[in-house]
Curated annotation (Swiss-Prot):
The lineage of its organism: Eukaryota, Fungi, Dikarya, Ascomycota, Pezizomycotina. It comes from Aspergillus fumigatus (strain ATCC MYA-4609 / CBS 101355 / FGSC A1100 / Af293). It comes from the Eukaryota. This is Transcription factor ncaA. Residues 1-40, 79-114, 429-575 are annotated as: Disordered. GO terms for cellular component: nucleus.
Amino acid sequence: MAETTPSRPNDTPENSPGGGDDNQSQSAGQSKNPASVKDRKCQYCHQAFTSSSLGRHLDQYLFKKKPDGVHDVEEIRRIRSGITRRQARTSSGKRDTPERAMGKGPSEHFAGGEYGAKPREGAIRMMFNTPTWHATGVINDIPNPGQTPEGSRFATSQSRTGVIHLPDYASRGASAKDPDTMRALELALREVLDNIKAATSRMRPRLSPFDFDIQSETFPSLCLRLLPPPPSLFSTNPFPSPSSFPLKPPGVEHLDIVRQAIRAKIDQWQSDQLSTQSANNSPGRPPLGLDANMISRSAQQHEDMSLRHLELAFKHWASLPPETRLEAWHLEITRAFAREVEKRKTLDEQLARVQQEANQLRAQVEKLGSCQWPREFALFPPDTLPLPPAVARELDAKESQISPGSPRWDYDSVVAKWKRVVMHDKSMGRVGVGYGNPPLDDRSSADTKARATEEPPASAALASTSTSAPPSAHPPPRALQPAPGPALAASPDQSSSHTGGASAPSSQNTSPYLRSPQAGPQAKRPRLMNGADGGHTSAANPSATAPNTWNPHSHQSLPGSNLASASGPPPSSGA
């Protein structure tokens, strides 16, 4: 059979719409063919090129070919640097723009300055995924050493606007947003308090005008505590002044001076109390519960009590003999010196702590100024750990293993250690340690107890069954054959000697999680449905007529059901 080859495809009818579309597409393709003809000429060598190949031809003399004396390299560089070059090959709509269509006209001639249009002034163009000239064959942004045209200025502005330099603080706190890091910081830095609030908090005024117990002082000790030292105390020949304490045992002339000093102390305390009470009346501060009348009454009480004690102390001092007064005066001077030594020691410790806090606050201010302070510390500044000067000197020792430069005090090391702890706790919580499934745990514990209670009756029943029936007459069903497990592999003699009745004890001693409900050897773990192994129950009791399903909530029905199934008649050979 000779068939003529049709002029069009067999699956396309002659008068179908698809055929018309094909003809239209072919005609459209034929109409576009003349657009790719070589309608351009090089103004130097007068060779014919297409509109795209002419640019590549001129670019050859800028980068690859050497000057041949025919093509003007400087003129070509000036022309090619001011044109708008095409971008990616996948961009659509570039070839059909009005500027492109106008450029294809026959009236356009290749001339210097007219080949490419200048970019629009004021327009900001962002180009992403710009291919290189190795991929497209078109070289962009050709520099011109002679002058600075519009194209180079546009390229410079484009490079400035295209690359966005993010500040360092934009990504500085990225690690603080990590939950593990935040938890590690919480464990590493346990104490976080508001240092700024503590530094600006006002102190409560003293409840007493004196910083000592005036009722326990003698007259010479009151003179040493309330009166100032003589101005000429450190001179060659010191002498007392009328308002200072004496260099010899005090007498009756110092009674009025001490009385005036007591009243001055109480008046100063009352003035401080009144100023504090007026400051508390400002809005935003909680009141201290003091008013002017209460302060005045308290000041009067302190004055009466202090003056009364002063009179009693002076009477006792005046009744002593001169030798006893001299010894008591020397003793009070020694006590005053010892008190000042203790006070100096306490003040030194407080000064060291204040200096440490000042250094920490200064470092915090520097970090805040340079935007290096973490966000968490801005909310909860860390507390200052008071370190005695002796401990600080030990830490600064060069040979010490606990110096600040030691790796054990490194921030990254401490945070990494606690981060490992946090991740470990999280992984353990996800796995289930401490968060186990209660129904599954109850199921396994109940099954273990049931198997422990039913082992002696089951073994006795199986022993009587094995003695009454020969092993060859009643082969065990396939579903009751023991699965290959660690217990059977350890005792192969027991499995080979008891072929008829060893399957039941092995199935009972084997955990239900290690047996398959299907026949044959175990391939994978059985799936528990609603906390019970239904396949195991049906396979272990093939001859039971009543449904003896295992209930996870009734633990007492397990031994009876298993004993009934174990002591039942073995399956007949004809089944």
